[in-house]
Amino acid sequence: MIEITLLGTGSPIPDPDRAGPSTLVRAGGQVFLVDCGRGVLQRAAAVGVGAAGLSAVLLTHLHSDHIAELGDVLITSWVTNFAADPAPLQVIGPPGTAETVDAMLKAFGRDIGYRIAHHADLNAPPPIEVHEYTDGTVWDRDGVAIRVAPTDHRPVAPTIGFRVEFDGASAVLAGDTVPCPSLDELAAGAGALVHTVIRKDIITNFPQQRVKDICDYHSSVQEAAATAARAGVGTLVMTHYVPAIIAGQEDQWRALAATEFGGRIELGNDLHRVEVHAR
């Protein structure tokens, strides 16, 4: 079984009720943090997960709303890990991830120096290993396998989606993307597809062109549902709602998805949990 927890279902716009985009995936005793939106560590703490307990951080792309708390994750995983010889935190993402991680560590350089000077058992900077991929297998440990494929979030490029497999169960995390054949292939037959969604019917009515531009490189509810249908997935898990779902309108969003997808449809607030079993 794979357990999916929507840690943050929000967007770049700060929301008092929704953390930034982030999803927790647990499989075979391993814990993966997919994207690091604002507030992610507080949300993770609410389900008993700390930064030092992460098996890996998986980044779909390097937009600010998806990496806003990456620096905090890097530092907190270091200062809260009390192992004598802690294993490096694994960070997996598209090309550009290593540069981003290096820049964040540089930004925290003074803090890192202060802590090394103060604590005898912190004698080196945070141990981190960065792996950059656009396609193929990125993880294969103790029964858990993860592979990636390109998605289409242009002009943001490259971007990737992740497929996590364990004991016959599978979950795909699409990140931000418009429909594309590579995502269809990655998601084919998966137990669940976690997909960001926007309401283009609402967004196109905003007067600001910058807001309307969001429609260029995100999937609408119906487009995400159509991707799920083409791929033959069991469950569509919608997240990263733009605009934020107003309480009482959940059925409206489900109904839009149901016009394209006949399977199980999940959406909810932060900390919404979905179990994915072998198909």
UniProtKB/Swiss-Prot annotation:
EC nos: 3.1.26.11
Cofactor(s) listed: Zn(2+)
SUPFAM superfamilies: Metallo-hydrolase/oxidoreductase
Catalyzed reactions per annotation: Endonucleolytic cleavage of RNA, removing extra 3' nucleotides from tRNA precursor, generating 3' termini of tRNAs. A 3'-hydroxy group is left at the tRNA terminus and a 5'-phosphoryl group is left at the trailer molecule
Main function: Zinc phosphodiesterase, which displays some tRNA 3'-processing endonuclease activity. Probably involved in tRNA maturation, by removing a 3'-trailer from precursor tRNA.
UniProt subunit comment: Homodimer.
PANTHER family, alphabetized: ZINC PHOSPHODIESTERASE ELAC PROTEIN 1
Assigned keywords, A-Z: Endonuclease, Hydrolase, Metal-binding, Nuclease, tRNA processing, Zinc
Catalytic center residues: 65 (proton acceptor)
Protein name per the record: Ribonuclease Z
Gene Ontology MF, one: metal ion binding
Top-level taxon of origin: Bacteria
Protein residues bound to Zn(2+) 2: 65-66, 176, 240
Keyword Zinc-finger in annotation: no
CC cofactor note: Binds 2 Zn(2+) ions.
One Pfam family from the record: Lactamase_B_2
Family: Belongs to the RNase Z family.
Lineage: Bacteria, Bacillati, Actinomycetota, Actinomycetes, Mycobacteriales
